[in-house]
Amino acid sequence: MSIIDQVKQTLIEEIEVSIRKANLAEDIPEIKIEIPKDPKNGDYSSNIAMVLTKIAKRNPREIAQAIVDHLDTSKAHVKQVDIAGPGFINFYLDNQYLTAIIPEAITKGDRFGYATQSKNTNILLEYVSANPTGDLHIGHARNASVGDSLANILIAAGYNVTREYYINDAGNQITNLARSIEARYFEALGDTSYEMPADGYNGKDIIEIGKDLAVKHPEIKDYTDEERLKTFRQLGVDYEMEKLKKDLSDFNVHFDNWFSETSLYENGAIENTLSKMKELGYTYEADGATWLRTSDFKDDKDRVLIKKDGNYTYFTPDTAYHYNKINRGNDILIDLMGADHHGYINRLKASLETFGVDSDRLEIQIMQMVRLMQNGEEVKMSKRTGNAITLREIMDEVGIDAARYFLTMRSPDSHFDFDLELAKEQSQDNPIYYAQYAHARICSILKQAKEQGIEVSTDADFSKINNDKAIDLLKKVAEFESTIESAAEHRAPHRLTNYIQDLAAAFHKFYNAEKVLTDDTEKTKAYVAMIEAVRITLHNALALVGVTAPESM
């Protein structure tokens, strides 16, 4: 529990004791402690007096006064309590207690802000899962950035997280990929009798694969059609996945598992899943197809599992896959999906309910669209290729750090305009530059301090820190752990980028108002230790969203 959370908890406990002493209520409602928007209203505030009005049957200001009269403030660093407006209780703290965060941050280093105890909860987080049929585009990039950041944050908050990529290597799109490669393969051998599929893949990469295979594997031309299709399917997927993994790795996005859809067919998981659902009485035959009674579990209609032609729908392997996830001992499943998958939420949740699995254990977060903007206009196509802009091109254009940060700093359920020009600016208007510059500026000051013989020390006299801007900065540092917890709980990495901006702003304000290296040696030592705590916090926060913290810029 962070220092700030400890203070809040102490205030809640003391208010509860005061309410009982004043005989205001036996069953006490939830007591909330908030940070006022206006610092003039204190460091913390509670509206409990208004909440108790109906229970105590008294004027809220009278209730507030009764609470204050019985309040023991000695344990919570309170120096003043006021009653404001209709009955708000405002607490003004002796903020010297905040300096305890400095040695804590310095001592914990790279682990500062992280939970010290495991939540003993296993989460399987699936993200990206793009079809291995071409390059990753800007939508995949947002999914990757948010997914990887969320995984980092959940781990920091004490969850056990498995990062998984589901390889869609068994559907019709892979057959089309194989037939496209086949046409380019024979074309490279001078045989143009093999036509591209109507919905085939016409990218330059497919032409290159065909040429490469024609040189390295001329024997494939003599295979039977079935053998050739199987070979091109596997080689095509392998080629695309190798390229995709390289792009994701360079984007600082990582996975623990690469789960193949084909494996669900090969190990009998799909057949076993269908048998289980039939055994439980949730399947039925109608119109020549096999259906699942998903409407029994809040889906708007039942869903087809096996079509009239005997082939599975896309829903069938997806159902088997999610049942497999549960059977691997995961407590919570989180899927990050594109906006076009919104209709999948209820049917997937319903499919788990058929197995007696609480559908609340499956969380599906829909990622909204990203528009790339340049000079106020949307950029839809690459000038180089004429195709959709790829993740690789985004990384090359603005850099990995800027791409990661920009794609994470908005709520994933909101549409986002990615300003390519802003992402490249070296100014305080650019959020990532502003944050990284704060870190680099601190490193520069620490270097100067060291040259003057002043080292970072946890034994400095922190009573020297009494400047308002310094206290505001320490408050932000003290909020780091609770921000991680909040971002994890709400599956919201953008809460952390918002925090990073606030922390950087607090540092820049302090820097502009106060000199760190002064003639007062003791004060300088205290400030040097303080900005090292800020540096550690910035470094750790940026790392959680996959961004570097440069020492110079």
Curated annotation (Swiss-Prot):
It is found in: Cytoplasm. GO terms for molecular function: arginine-tRNA ligase activity; ATP binding. It is an enzyme of class 6 (ligase). Its EC number is 6.1.1.19. Keywords: Aminoacyl-tRNA synthetase, ATP-binding, Cytoplasm, Ligase, Nucleotide-binding, Protein biosynthesis. Gene3D superfamilies: Arginyl tRNA synthetase N-terminal domain, HUPs, Isoleucyl-tRNA Synthetase, Domain 1. The keyword Membrane does not apply. It catalyses: tRNA(Arg) + L-arginine + ATP = L-arginyl-tRNA(Arg) + AMP + diphosphate. GO terms for biological process: arginyl-tRNA aminoacylation. Pfam families: Arg_tRNA_synt_N, DALR_1, tRNA-synt_1d. SUPFAM superfamilies: Anticodon-binding domain of a subclass of class I aminoacyl-tRNA synthetases (SSF47323), Arginyl-tRNA synthetase (ArgRS), N-terminal 'additional' domain (SSF55190), Nucleotidylyl transferase (SSF52374). The keyword Transport does not apply. Monomer. NCBIfam families: argS. This is Arginine--tRNA ligase. The gene is argS.
